[in-house]
């Protein structure tokens, strides 16, 4: 299995599949926001940023999968998936155990050199409350679904990193 994951990490297909899944999730979030009129909270926006990190890592990996640049993509992938797990866990706890003392920020805080909320307000401005339950599917809220998704991204990322020393076996039918 590790040899297979190593081989997949050196091809564009797996990276493009990851980019497709992350892009599909981002488009779904925008659909929830602009079509279903659900208000994203601050943690939702941060989770969206973590998902953009996974998307960016996938695109970097797809650009040059056989070069050392794929290791940069793996680091970004690991970091983004880990931060996504942290953020969605915090968000899930806020929704499952609401408290007037445990709240999220009132507005998104981006660095001054990257004010995404001012550049693309349709995507990065938060207007909802983190503790409010707006949507559920099969008995789970949106942060709980995202927690499972980010855990899956993280597990696969760890396995791909572990698989890097395991090179694919050369198949030689004639024993040359």
UniProtKB/Swiss-Prot annotation:
Any one GO cellular component localisation term in the record: plasma membrane
Which InterPro entries does the entry mention?
Answer: DiS_bond_form_DsbB/BdbC (IPR003752), Disulphide_bond_form_DsbB (IPR022920), DsbB (IPR050183), DsbB-like_sf (IPR023380)
Which Pfam family is an annotated match for this chain, by its short name? DsbB
Gene3D superfamilies for this protein: DsbB-like
Q: Which cysteines are joined by disulfide bonds?
A: 41-44, 104-130
Coiled coil feature spans: none
Keywords for the protein's UniProt record, in alphabetical order: Cell inner membrane, Cell membrane, Chaperone, Disulfide bond, Electron transport, Membrane, Oxidoreductase, Redox-active center, Transmembrane, Transmembrane helix, Transport
Q: Does the keyword Nucleotide-binding apply?
A: no
GO MF term set: electron transfer activity; protein-disulfide reductase activity
Membrane-crossing ranges are 15-31, 50-65, 72-89, 145-163
Which of the residues are on side Periplasmic? 32-49, 90-144
- Please cite one Gene Ontology biological process associated with this protein: protein folding
Please list the residue ranges that the record places on the Cytoplasmic side of the membrane: 1-14, 66-71, 164-176
Q: What membrane topology was assigned to this protein in its record?
A: Multi-pass membrane protein
The listed locations are: Cell inner membrane
What superkingdom heads the lineage? Bacteria
> Which HAMAP family does this entry report, sorted A to Z?
DsbB
Family membership, please give it. Answer: Belongs to the DsbB family.
Q: Which NCBIfam families match?
A: PRK01749.1 (NF002485)
Role: Required for disulfide bond formation in some periplasmic proteins such as PhoA or OmpA. Acts by oxidizing the DsbA protein.
Which PANTHER family does the protein's record reference?
Answer: DISULFIDE BOND FORMATION PROTEIN B (PTHR36570:SF2)
Q: What protein name applies here?
A: Disulfide bond formation protein B
What is the source species? Shigella flexneri
Lineage in the entry? Bacteria, Pseudomonadati, Pseudomonadota, Gammaproteobacteria, Enterobacterales
Gene name of the encoded protein: dsbB
């Amino acid at each position: 299995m590790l040899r297979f994951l190593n081989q997949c990490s050196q091809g564009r297909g797996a990276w493009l599949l990851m980019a497709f899944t992350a892009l599909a999730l981002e488009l779904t979030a925008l659909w929830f926001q602009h079509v279903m009129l659900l208000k994203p909270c601050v943690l939702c926006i941060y989770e969206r940023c973590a998902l953009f990190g996974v998307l960016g890592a996938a695109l970097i990996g797809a650009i040059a999968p056989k070069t050392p640049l794929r290791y940069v993509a793996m680091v970004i992938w690991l970091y983004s998936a880990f931060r996504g797990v942290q953020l969605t866990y915090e968000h899930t706890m806020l929704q499952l155990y609401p408290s007037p003392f445990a709240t999220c920020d009132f507005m998104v805080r981006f660095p001054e050199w990257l004010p995404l909320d001012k550049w693309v307000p349709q995507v990065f401005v938060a207007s909802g409350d983190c503790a409010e339950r707006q949507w559920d599917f099969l008995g789970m809220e949106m942060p709980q679904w995202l927690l499972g998704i980010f855990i899956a991204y993280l597990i696969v990322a760890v396995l791909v990193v572990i698989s890097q020393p395991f090179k694919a076996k050369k198949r030689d039918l004639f024993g040359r």
